[in-house]
């Protein structure tokens, strides 16, 4: 087993803070990196060492050569990529491997295979994992041929960037006349965000549940899952609330999906922490969607129901430790819910709301956890993802977990900037959420009700906003008919 004495965290904000705390628990030195706008971010303040990687807000976090250079210069044994930025960049993992630095994640070739959704689909189908009916990459085909593919699959269809993720590079098409514009738009976005304009097509599963299984595998072929998470509460393909385990699915279905998730991970020779994502339709048919070859934003709810620290497990597996858990050891207890609190203005179509935080009082109490990087007087920069904090609740039942979530959100104070806290409270008040009736259309379907229940602390013209959004939603529905 390799000894890890110092870890560089190639990331920022909340996930960097999370990894630094795991390092402290293991008595491992932590190294933060930052760009100039992040100089006052919490991860920089609490790390044992911190190094600036540039003045540009984003570019430094994507500079493979510079990050590896700093890791070597400071004597880091390993690099943890977090999520986002370079976390699923196989060239970064390969650069670490070539430099003799432990990459805390899967091997570079696995990241490469699973990072291309088209390749991943083929691999899963070859190994008997159910996939959504669809095509290979479409870029070499004419538009007339693409229209024929769509007709054979049947509308609605969804166009996806092969190298995509995070809700980018996705277009849902309900009728043929919209296909060409959607295809060109999807290609442009894919090229901008992923430097790869490959696009493929799938049958669009209408209003599915988005269910993912947490995978953990060591370097010796031992792979298990740590139960599932329901990530169906989304807005524009971005997760808003996650729940573990999934309310309202049978034990038999849960077992079948879990076995399939492990088989999918074994098919690619997976190591470390990862996630197999499925779509579940109204008939309990499930389909492989993608694999995330990194730690997930929502990993804390799995930790809460299993008692397993995933970041510590990542580090130990990367150091060569044998996984001392079997599938029969994993027995979830209770329910956990995570709500992502973001700096967004609900009343202006969720535009980012950066600025200086005034009073800051995170929620407290039994079985309440907050993972965050913010503090009183911290200035939220405009350059990054708008997430401020993750509020994680644990309870013995789903009903009690929802009650606790509502209470904790009401106690959570972040002053002087707009946040989604009131909107999240509104979600907890809906009958469908409380009953566990969840699917990916939840927020869109209930948007008018949610806005009516959202407390407007800044006293904007709420009625006009709701009316405008209702009219927009009506137009969207009519365009699909």
Where are these regions (language model features)?
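Conserved beta3 strand of the protein kinase N-lobe
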Residues: 134-135
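Acidic/histidine-enriched active-site and ligand-binding environments that engage anionic O-linkages
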Residues: 148-158
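Glycine/aspartate-rich loop-and-adjacent alpha/beta segment that forms the canonical ThDP
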Residues: 171
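Conserved A3 ("GATE") glycine/threonine-rich loop of ANL adenylate-forming enzymes
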Residues: 117-119, 164-168, 334
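ATP-dependent carboxylate activation and anion-phosphoryl transfer catalytic cores
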Residues: 2-26, 30, 50-51, 72-74, ...
